[in-house]
């Protein structure tokens, strides 16, 4: 009987874990599908964030009222101007069962006539038991943590 219960527990838990994308794949999809997560109303994005980071996005949205808030640049770029060139590479820097740091390395193009600079942004992901990855923090190419910036006292 105990063996049967153990097998049933593995079967019921197995598909949920198997259905979760790998951390780098999750980060790539988040980048592609939710690039402006930092600038719009937070409600549509909350399902992809931890409750803690979601609360900070809500706080920042309330503070900024749809205008520039604590960030005066695109956090993916680490700049106001320019664009992300190709190729964009996602790789896991550290990973444990409940946390991962994924780096996004890309050529930053400010002026097409000049060689691009290498920029790296980091997505800090968390996973709770029986859940998939969620964004817990975002570190800009400048090294600024959105969690830290968004939790700053309002001026």
Task: Enumerate the predicted regions with their spans.
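Positively charged n-region of N-terminal signal peptides that target proteins for export
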Residues: 1-4
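N-terminal signal peptide c-region/cleavage motif recognized by signal peptidases
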Residues: 12-15
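Short, aromatic-enriched amphipathic alpha-helices that serve as compact interaction elements
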Residues: 20-38
